[in-house]
Amino acid sequence: MITVLINGGLGNQLFQVFATLATAIRNEDTCYFMHMPRDATGKRTTYWKSLLHNLMPLTVISTPSNVQRFMRLPVHQETGFRYTKLPSKTAMNSTPLKLVGYFQSDKYFADVRDEIYAKIQLIEQHDGIKTMFQDSAWFSGGAMTIAMHFRIGDYAQIQDAHPILPLEYYRRALHHIVSNVPSADLYKPNDDGNDVITDVKFNVLIFNQACDDEVVLEHMRALKADPEFAKRCRFYKVPDMFEDWKQMLLMSVCAHNIIANSTFSWWGAYFNQNPGKMVCYPSAWFGPALKHDTRDLFPADWVKINSLI
């Protein structure tokens, strides 16, 4: 049996949950998760009653005795940031093995990704979020949707480790997408049956934390004023009232993704089922204080965009 120490925000938690599920599937083993309202630090909420509610049968109530047993379990500690193979014979263990780490690479679970998607009912959750926003201007007029994520707030004091991305990164990423979308994707039939190209070809959905609204709205105004985007794009600020996990799902039903140096929008892009999606990620994921090797973090078909000023 396998379990894991849940630590960090939603993006980090998903890496931990997916790595655990994948190891159990691969090893023909069982797994469980400690059902706690917050992560190991006590600072971040967990998502057993929302995004991950379909995994509830795999959770164990966090009674004091269960927590004590959990804390005493033997540990498999992640040894570095790059992908390393997880134990392959866990089904033979008489005592559950506890994974501890971040496991930030889809190499931990890509081979059984669809099976895990089925377990969390990702397709059904996509259908639900599409229905929720089907009448929104965001998805109207035949325009293609692009999710753009800004991460500023908690990075402001730790930029040596997690740099704040400059506006120029987003400008370059948006340029890459609007310049590389096949022209056939920008046409739609009109009333007489002929294909016409619309003036507005892209609806750009802006995602950020409420504390960053002032800076992000300034960036949005700058992008709107850019001659390259002024006539081709409409920009929409996604309201802060939506729960974070719903925002992640909303990112994932857009056609394309421009992510921040954040595992939150990494998953918003990874969950995207559009076979023709373009995902842009920043060249600088960490700052100089963190020497992590990120070669295994990004799928091969994602596009690295220069994020230096």
Per-range role (PLM):
Residues 1-3:
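Extreme N-terminal starter segment of soluble prokaryotic enzymes
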Residues 6-15:
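A short, glycine/small-residue-rich beta-strand->loop->alpha-helix junction that serves as a flexible
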Residues 16-23:
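Short amphipathic alpha-helix
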Residues 29-40:
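A short beta-strand-loop structural module common to alpha/beta enzyme folds
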Residues 40-202, 298, 305:
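Secretory-pathway luminal glycosyltransferase catalytic domains
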Residues 41-57, 214-229, 291-298:
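Short, aromatic/basic amphipathic alpha-helical patches
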Residues 197-289:
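Donor-binding and catalytic core of enzymes assembling or modifying cell-surface/extracellular glycoconjugates
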Residues 287-309:
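Leloir-type glycosyltransferase catalytic cores
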